[in-house]
C-alpha cells in the first residue's frame, strides 16, 4: 500500500489507494478546499486520480503556476459547456491553454457577433457560479469514440482516429450534461473558474491547414482571483494605448497598405528613427571591431540548395525567375556573407573575421500572421557572422553576450531572459557536431554568470542558439537577440582558411543578431516609450515657437543655431496662439519646446518646456544647446531636470 512523501520530507502511510484530494483532506480541510490537482512523481494528475504505489506528492493550488494553467484549461471546457447550451449544434474542435488564457476553436453555422460573445460570457458565469463538480472518467478508445459520434462531435472523432492509440484510455470530463475529452488535469469543481473574460474571436483553419475548414476561435483570459484579472485587463488597456500601430499613425512614422502586405512604407519621421538606430548600431560595430558589408538581396536557387535552406525553408522564401534561372529573395544573410568570406585566400591570422550587415530580408509569412511592424514580410536585420577557429569560439561568444547586454541597456531594458535552444528533429550535421556546439554555448553563458534555461529541440536546423528575450514596461516578452553556432554552413559553401600547419581548415560561423528585425525593434520601442522616444531617438528633438510675428527673425536665427549644433529642430511660426502650438507639439511627443517672446529676444534667452509639461524657465541659449548636445550624445533616457 502506498507511502506518500510530501515536499517537506514527511510521509503518510495508507492501506489503500488514495488520491491527491484524499491526502489533502488528511492534512486539513483548508488545503483540501484549495486543491486543484496533484504532482505525483513529477507528473501532473487530477485531484481524483488514485495513487496505488509509493510516490512523492505535491498539492497544486491556485497559487502555483500549474494551478493557474489548469484553471485556464478548465475555463476552455466551461466555454464549451456554455456554447453548447446556447447553440447546441456547435461542433467543438480544440481548446488549449495559451499565454494568459485559453481559446476554443468551434464550428458554428453563424458568425459570432460581439453580442453573441457577451451572451456566451454571461452563460459561462451563470454555469461557473453553480460550483458544480467536474467528473473525470477514463474510458476505452471505442467508448470515447462512440460517445462523440452520438453527440455529432466530428472533430473529436477525428482526433481519436488520427491522434490517439486504440489501446489508450482517453479522459472524458463531465461538466453536467457537457462532455469534453482531454489529457487533463482539470479543476475538481467550478468554484475555481469564476475570474475570466472572453477577449476576441478570430478565424482558424482546422489543424492549421488552409485546405481545411475555417473555424471560429474564441479567446479568453482567466485568473485565480478578481484582483489578478483586473490587473491584467488594466495592462491590456495600457498596451492598447501604447499600440505601435496607433502611435505610428498619430506620429506619422509609417504606414502599411494592401498592395504591399507586410512591407513598410517609412515616412520621414519614422525613417529618421530607423537611421538613428543604424547610427547607434554602427557605433557598436566599430567598438566591437566588425566590418560592415552589403550583399545582394537575391541569389540563384542553386546556392540555397547547397546551404540546405531550400529543403528546410522553401515555403517561406519568395522566388522569381529570369532567363531560365530561378532566384530566391534572401530570407537571411548568412549565405551571402560566406560568399564574401570566400573571396581571396584566408589565413588563421585573418580570424576572427566579424562581418556585419543591415541585411534586407524577405520571408513569406502567412497573411493572417502579419501585425504592424511586429510581424512583416520585408525587414532589415542587424545581422553579423563571425568566422573563427574552434579555439576562438568561447571568446567570441563571450564578446557577443557582452555586446547584447551593452546595447539593450541603452534602451533601459533590464529584465532579460536567456534560453539555449538545442537540436531539433529536423537538422543537418552529426550528433558529435551538435554536442560540441551546445556545450560551447552553455559554457559561455556560465562564464558570464548568466542564468539560462534549455529549450529542447528549438534550435535552427544548422546549429544551436542562445536566445535573448527582453521584457518591456508591461512585462511583455520580446525575443530579439540570437547568438548561434554553425558548424555546417561553412563546409557546405566551401569556406576555408589556411591553418598554422599550412593545411586548409573549415572555419566555424557564429550567427549574431541583437536588435533582430529593425522594424520590429522600432515597434517594440514605440510601445515601450509610448511614443515618448528619448531625445537622441526622437524624429524632431526641438520645436522653436514665436508668440507674435515680432519674434520670427529671432526664432529663425535660433533654429539655424540649433541645426548647426547637430540638433533636429523645426521652427513653428504659424499665426496661432502659443497654447495651441504647445498642445500640438506635446501631442507629437516632441521632447523640447522653446518659446520666444519679447523678453527672451531682449535677453538673448529662450523659455524651455518639456513634452511632459515641465517649465524649465528662461535659459541662456548656449547653455540649452550644450545641455541638449550632452543629452543626445550620451543617449540618455532622461530629459533635462528629470
UniProtKB/Swiss-Prot annotation:
Entry function: Catalyzes the attachment of threonine to tRNA(Thr) in a two-step reaction: L-threonine is first activated by ATP to form Thr-AMP and then transferred to the acceptor end of tRNA(Thr). Also edits incorrectly charged L-seryl-tRNA(Thr).
EC number per UniProt: 6.1.1.3
Main location: cytoplasm
Name of the featured protein: Threonine--tRNA ligase
Chemical reaction(s) catalysed: tRNA(Thr) + L-threonine + ATP = L-threonyl-tRNA(Thr) + AMP + diphosphate + H(+)
GO biological process, one term: threonyl-tRNA aminoacylation
CDD domains tied to this protein: TGS_ThrRS, ThrRS_anticodon, ThrRS_core
Top-level EC class as recorded in UniProt: ligase
Cofactor note: Binds 1 zinc ion per subunit.
Description of how the protein assembles with itself and partners: Homodimer.
Domain of life: Bacteria
Compartmental location: Cytoplasm
Region (Catalytic): 243-534
Family: Belongs to the class-II aminoacyl-tRNA synthetase family.
Amino acid at each position: 500500500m502506498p507511502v506518500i512523501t510530501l515536499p517537506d520530507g514527511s510521509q503518510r502511510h495508507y492501506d489503500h489507494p488514495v488520491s491527491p484530494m484524499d491526502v489533502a483532506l488528511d492534512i486539513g480541510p483548508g488545503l483540501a478546499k484549495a486543491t486543484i490537482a496533484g504532482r505525483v512523481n513529477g507528473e501532473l494528475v487530477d485531484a481524483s486520480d488514485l495513487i496505488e504505489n509509493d510516490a512523492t506528492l505535491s498539492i497544486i493550488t491556485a497559487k502555483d503556476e500549474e494551478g493557474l494553467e489548469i484553471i485556464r484549461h478548465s475555463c476552455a471546457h466551461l466555454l464549451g459547456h456554455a456554447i453548447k447550451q446556447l447553440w447546441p449544434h456547435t461542433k467543438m474542435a480544440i481548446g488549449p491553454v495559451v499565454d494568459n488564457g485559453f481559446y476554443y476553436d468551434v464550428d458554428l453555422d453563424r458568425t459570432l457577433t460581439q453580442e453573441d460573445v457577451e451572451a456566451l460570457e454571461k452563460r459561462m458565469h451563470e454555469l461557473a457560479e453553480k460550483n458544480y463538480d467536474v467528473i473525470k472518467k477514463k474510458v476505452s478508445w471505442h467508448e470515447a469514440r462512440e460517445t462523440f459520434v452520438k453527440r455529432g462531435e466530428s472533430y473529436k472523432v477525428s482526433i481519436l482516429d488520427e491522434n490517439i492509440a486504440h489501446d489508450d484510455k482517453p479522459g472524458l470530463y463531465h461538466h453536467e450534461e457537457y462532455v469534453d475529452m482531454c489529457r487533463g488535469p482539470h479543476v475538481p469543481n467550478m468554484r475555481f473558474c469564476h475570474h475570466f473574460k472572453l477577449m476576441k474571436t478570430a478565424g482558424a483553419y482546422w489543424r492549421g491547414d488552409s485546405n481545411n475548414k475555417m473555424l471560429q476561435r474564441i479567446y479568453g483570459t482567466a485568473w485565480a482571483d478578481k484582483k489578478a484579472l483586473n490587473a491584467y485587463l488594466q495592462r491590456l488597456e495600457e498596451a492598447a494605448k501604447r499600440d505601435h500601430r496607433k502611435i505610428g499613425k498619430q506620429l506619422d512614422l509609417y504606414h502599411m497598405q494592401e498592395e504591399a502586405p507586410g512591407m513598410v512604407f517609412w515616412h520621414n519621421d519614422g525613417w529618421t528613427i530607423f537611421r538613428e538606430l543604424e547610427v547607434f548600431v554602427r557605433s557598436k560595430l566599430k567598438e566591437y571591431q566588425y566590418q560592415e558589408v552589403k550583399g545582394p538581396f537575391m541569389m540563384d536557387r542553386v546556392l540555397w540548395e547547397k546551404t540546405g535552406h531550400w529543403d528546410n525553408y522553401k515555403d517561406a522564401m519568395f522566388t522569381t525567375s529570369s532567363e531560365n534561372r530561378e532566384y530566391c529573395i534572401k530570407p537571411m544573410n548568412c549565405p551571402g556573407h560566406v560568399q564574401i568570406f570566400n573571396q581571396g585566400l584566408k589565413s588563421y591570422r585573418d580570424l576572427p573575421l566579424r562581418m556585419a550587415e543591415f541585411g534586407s530580408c524577405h520571408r513569406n509569412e502567412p497573411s493572417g500572421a502579419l501585425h504592424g511592424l511586429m510581424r512583416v514580410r520585408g525587414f532589415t536585420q542587424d545581422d553579423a557572422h563571425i568566422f573563427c577557429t574552434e579555439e576562438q569560439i568561447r571568446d567570441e561568444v563571450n564578446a557577443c553576450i557582452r555586446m547584447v547586454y551593452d546595447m539593450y541597456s541603452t534602451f533601459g531594458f533590464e529584465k532579460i531572459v536567456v534560453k539555449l535552444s538545442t537540436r531539433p528533429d529536423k537538422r543537418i550535421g552529426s550528433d558529435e557536431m551538435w554536442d560540441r556546439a551546445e556545450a560551447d554555448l552553455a559554457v559561455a553563458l556560465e562564464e558570464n554568470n548568466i542564468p539560462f534555461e534549455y529549450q529542447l529541440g528549438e534550435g535552427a536546423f544548422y546549429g544551436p542558439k542562445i536566445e535573448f528575450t527582453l521584457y518591456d514596461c508591461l512585462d511583455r516578452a520580446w525575443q530579439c537577440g540570437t547568438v548561434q553556432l554553425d558548424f555546417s554552413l561553412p563546409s557546405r559553401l566551401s569556406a576555408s582558411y589556411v591553418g598554422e600547419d599550412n593545411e586548409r581548415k573549415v572555419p566555424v560561423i557564429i550567427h549574431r543578431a541583437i536588435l533582430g528585425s529593425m522594424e520590429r525593434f522600432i515597434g517594440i520601442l514605440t510601445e515601450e516609450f509610448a511614443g515618448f522616444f528619448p531625445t537622441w531617438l526622437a524624429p524632431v528633438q526641438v520645436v522653436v515657437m514665436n508668440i507674435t510675428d515680432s519674434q520670427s527673425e529671432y526664432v529663425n536665427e535660433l533654429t539655424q543655431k540649433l541645426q548647426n549644433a547637430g540638433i533636429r529642430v523645426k521652427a513653428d511660426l504659424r499665426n496661432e496662439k502659443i497654447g495651441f502650438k504647445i498642445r500640438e507639439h506635446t501631442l507629437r511627443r516632441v521632447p523640447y519646446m522653446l518659446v520666444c517672446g519679447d523678453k527672451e529676444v531682449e535677453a538673448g534667452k529662450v523659455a524651455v518646456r518639456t513634452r511632459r509639461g515641465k517649465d524649465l524657465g528662461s535659459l541662456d541659449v548656449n547653455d540649452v544647446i550644450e545641455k541638449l548636445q550632452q543629452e543626445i550624445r550620451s543617449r540618455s533616457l532622461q530629459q533635462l531636470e528629470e
